[in-house]
Each structure stands twice: as structure tokens, then as C-alpha cells.
């Protein structure tokens, strides 16, 4: 089993920043970036769990749910990652999304 602590910490930090962000920041780009990240993390988890099956898209639950969506998606992904390269790639995605979100 691979250590995913770096990944879950990165997402927890991003989620905390989203929860603390003003509504105006979420509306500008914070929530959209978080949703895009959650969808990508969920897609990757589904592809690892069921190769060859078309992944389902995570629904948009609204800007105030964005932090929860990335948290759920990363925990699902963390359960199926098999090597450090996958963890590092996912951490990079989280860090880039947080920068674009401006939080």
C-alpha cells in the first residue's frame, strides 16, 4: 500500500482554504477549480477501480460544496493508488488547482 499522506494533506489544506474563502472568491474561480479537480480525481479513481468502464462525472453540488467534493474524491482516489508516481501526480494536480483558484 502506498503512502498517500502528502495527497490527503494537500487536499485538506485546499479544502480549508475554500471553506474560509469569501463567496466572491468562490464565485470568481475557486469553486469552479475545485469542482474540476474533484471531477478529475474521481475520474482517476474510477479508472483504477474499473478499467474499461466509462467513468461517471461528479455532479456540480454548488459552490459551497466544492471543498467537500474534493475531500471525498481524494479519499476515494487514495484507496486505489498503487505507486508513488500516481501520488506525486495527484499532489501536483491539487497544488496547481489551488493556485488557479487563488485561495
Feature roles, as predicted:
Residues 68-103:
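Amphipathic alpha-helical binding modules
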Residues 46-82:
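Amphipathic protein-protein interaction modules
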